[in-house]
From Swiss-Prot:
The gene is aos. The keyword Transmembrane helix does not apply. It is found in: Secreted. Two-fingered domain repeats lie at residues 316-370, 378-444. Disulfide bonds join 141-162, 147-285, 164-307, 316-341, 343-370, 378-405, 384-413, 407-440. This is Protein giant-lens. The keyword Repeat applies. GO terms for cellular component: extracellular space. Residues 1-24 form the signal peptide. It comes from Drosophila melanogaster. Glycans are attached at residue 333. It comes from the Eukaryota.
Amino acid sequence: MPTTLMLLPCMLLLLLTAAAVAVGGTRLPLEVFEITPTTSTADKHKSLQYTVVYDAKDISGAAAATGVASSTVKPATEQLTVVSISSTAAAEKDLAESRRHARQMLQKQQQHRSIIGGKHGDRDVRILYQVGDSEEDLPVCAPNAVCSKIDLYETPWIERQCRCPESNRMPNNVIIHHHSHSSGSVDSLKYRNYYEREKMMQHKRMLLGEFQDKKFESLHMKKLMQKLGAVYEDDLDHLDQSPDYNDALPYAEVQDNEFPRGSAHMRHSGHRGSKEPATTFIGGCPSSLGVEDGHTIADKTRHYKMCQPVHKLPVCTHFRDYTWTLTTAAELNVTEQIVHCRCPRNSVTYLTKREPIGNGSPGYRYLFACSPLTRLRCQRKQPCKLFTVRKRQEFLDEVNINSLCQCPKGHRCPSHHTQSGVIAGESFLEDNIQTYSGYCMAND
């Protein structure tokens, strides 16, 4: 007995240590858990046979059990209560008045939210940090790194990955040429002349010494500013017409899909339309929920924001090029996502390879490639979509979606793991992950 009491504190210490390691360990990104029919769960998904939950026998048995239970219970004797008719009418009137007042208050709240929803919608987005709880705790982004990840599955929320360098913290990094303006004050003309002579013509004076060849100076400055990362508005229309141009909405042209359709294309840095709102930044990283800022790569239900404009990235080749790599560092408890190229239109990403970092580091590097959208028709009792759901400590559901096949005509695939036609699958308790299989449902 004394020996057991002496060993009890040691056992408690080991349990606490294991719990601390489990909580404080490196949390892998959910994109790493790509559970598809090509993995070890292929046979389970292929041979999956589900029966009707409420069978006729179960219903009849339940009704019989209910009847037996109800026949054995005797009703309790109730005493008659004399109620005044006038008091009952007054109570009903007060209840109706309170309900009417509650409906009016609810309508006022809804009108207030609809009015201010467009103005302050982005302010209500929850912001999480993969390290610490402020911008100062985040590392500085590497070249072509993802600075923020926006989840649009349910309520939008942002996970900050890193801080953009100071050289990239220019919200409108686009040069607008000074065209001839007929209307303008003398002060503005003086400012333009001073700006051109003291700033734009500085390199010209060093090369030629005189203000003579304006065409040469403009070309020289244009190439110099392009090397610094600026984008000229004259080049935007030319890039828009490229056949390899990515519209960042791969599901917009797919038939019978549940994703929102839209005609928005991936714009470039600072190139905004007349009706598009100004881009907001957090730590130098764009934080708007749309793809019009030119720094966004859309994949499934996530938007990946970058410090650099995405049009500078080359276009990937299906199944051959790695679109991005996820590197986990256990000692720093951070994950770095580096984008190498952008997927073509109507493409999705998938996990293709995992390799150790090397150099004695315990982390891994996950490689992702591009794949065209599946055109295979779903067979009978075959899941059309797989949901991988992880419960986070911030009381959020992080969900990854894998489309397995296309539902036949007249059917739809569930878009949420809580909708009808979705059945719970395998669980991974060590990673706090639950999988769900979605099946085709007939349209109402």
